[in-house]
C-alpha cells in the first residue's frame, strides 16, 4: 500500500482519538449556591453546633478557599457577577439608588441580553444546562412573554424554580420586608393627612377658619386611598411575585413551602440522571437560608439554632443527596462541584419574636449589604477527585467571578474577546501549579459605588484593604444597620474617609485596627498605589443602561405573569408532588 494511502486511516484514527479524549476530559459541572449563608455556618469553617456533614465531606474531599469573596454583598449583583465573570457595574446590574435588588417579577430590569453567561458558553460546547432554584436576575423587558432576562435566554436548557427571590412576604405570618420603607412612603403621609385634618377641624370649631365640608371629605378620601393601596399591595404581593416556574410556565402560584427543598433536590437529581452520557452543567441555587425561613417536618425543630439551623441542616442533607447520587452513578470522579453563598449572612434578620433569623459570619465584621469581610467573605469549596488533591486549604484571595473563566476553560470554550472578564482561572491554584492568586487587585462595590479596594502585592504576604467610605451602623457600636434592616451606600447612611481607612487583612482579618502613618510607615505610599489602581479600573467601565433605574425597577402591570385561573386571583397549583426523597 502506498505510504500516502496508509497515512489517511492513521490520521482518521488520530483525530477520532483526539475528539474522544477531549470529550472525556471535560468534567460535568455542578455549581451549588446558598442564599445568605454565613462563612461561620458550615462545620468545615469552624461551626461546632450546626450539623453540616455533607458540606464538610465536600470540603475534605477537595479544596477549601478561606478568602473567597463575593463580587457584591447583595443577591442580584452578586449573582450577575457570578454568571458573567464581570463586576456587576459593567452590565448595569448595580444600583445607584437605595434598593440594590429586584423586588418585583414584573420589573423590566434584569441581566442584559448581550451579557454572556457561563451557561451560554457551555451550551455552545455541547453541555446540557439547567438552573434549579433561585434566579433573581429579571424576567421580561417589553411584554410579559418576551422573557428577555429568563434563564432559558441566558444559556440554560431547563429551569425549575423561582424568578425572583424568597422573601418574608412570600410566607404567610412572616411579616414584610417593606415595613421599614412603608413607614416613610405610607405612614408619614397618613400622619400628615391626620394632623392636617385635626388642625383644620380645631380651627373650624374655634371659628378661626371656615373649612368647607368638601375639604374634610377630600382629606378623608386621600387617607383611605393611601391605606387601601398599602393594604392591597401587601395582600397581592405574594401571588404576584412568589411563584414556581418550569421553563416558561407557572406551575404553582403562590408557591408552597411544603417540601420545597426536597422538590428542588428531586429536580436536580432527575436532571443528572437524564444526562449521564453527556457533559452537563447544573446550577443548584437554594432558597435556603434567605428569609422566610422554612424546613420540612424531618428537620423542623431538630437543630440547636432554631429555624435557621433547621434550614441549614436541611440544605446540607440536599447536598448529601447529590453527592450520593454521583457516587451511585459513578460520576463523582468526573464532576467538578463548587459550593458557595451569594454573600455573607444577614445579621440584621431578627424575627418579630426576637429570634435570630440570620447566620454567622464567624470572626468577621459586618454582613450582607456591606463590604466589611463579613458581607463578602463566603464559603468556597471545590471538589474534582480526578484532578484536585483532597484536603487542601487555600488562603489566597479569590472571587465568585472566577468560576466563569474556570468552567469555560474546562469545557473548552474560548472566553469572549469583546469585553473585560474580571474573573481569573482557578485551576492553577487548585492543581497546585501556582501558589499565588492572579488577583493583584479586587474592587468592592456597595451597589454601584466603589467602596473599597483590596491589594495583594507581588512578593508580599500582606493583603491591604482600603475603604473610601463605611456604613454607619445603627445602633452605634452594633454590627449592622438594624434601623434600616440593611446598610445603604450613600448620603447620611455612610461616613466618607479621607484618607481612606486602611487595614492589613492578613494580620487583622477582623478589621478592628485601621492603620495610621504612625503604625504603618508606608501608609501614604500604599494608599497611592491603591488609588491609582482604582482610577485605572474605573476608566474601564463603560456607560451602560441602569437596570435599577426607576423605569426598570418599578412594577409594570403589563409584565405581570399570572397562571390561567378562574377570576383574577392568579392562583394555581400544577405542581406534581414528587415522592419525597428519604432522609
UniProtKB/Swiss-Prot annotation:
Its cofactor is Ca(2+). Ca(2+) binds at residues 35-36, 75, 342-343. This is Steryl-sulfatase. The chain crosses the membrane at residues 185-208, 213-234. The record marks 333, 459 as: Not glycosylated. It catalyses: dehydroepiandrosterone 3-sulfate + H2O = 3beta-hydroxyandrost-5-en-17-one + sulfate + H(+); estrone 3-sulfate + H2O = estrone + sulfate + H(+). SUPFAM superfamilies: Alkaline phosphatase-like (SSF53649). Its EC number is 3.1.6.2. It comes from Homo sapiens. Belongs to the sulfatase family. GO terms for molecular function: arylsulfatase activity; metal ion binding; steryl-sulfatase activity; sulfuric ester hydrolase activity. Changing residue 446 to Y: In IXL; loss of steryl-sulfatase activity. It is a multi-pass membrane protein. Residues 22-184, 235-583 are lumenal. It comes from the Eukaryota. It is linked to Ichthyosis, X-linked: A keratinization disorder manifesting with mild erythroderma and generalized exfoliation of the skin within a few weeks after birth. Affected boys later develop large, polygonal, dark brown scales, especially on the neck, extremities, trunk, and buttocks. The modification 3-oxoalanine (Cys) is found at residue 75.
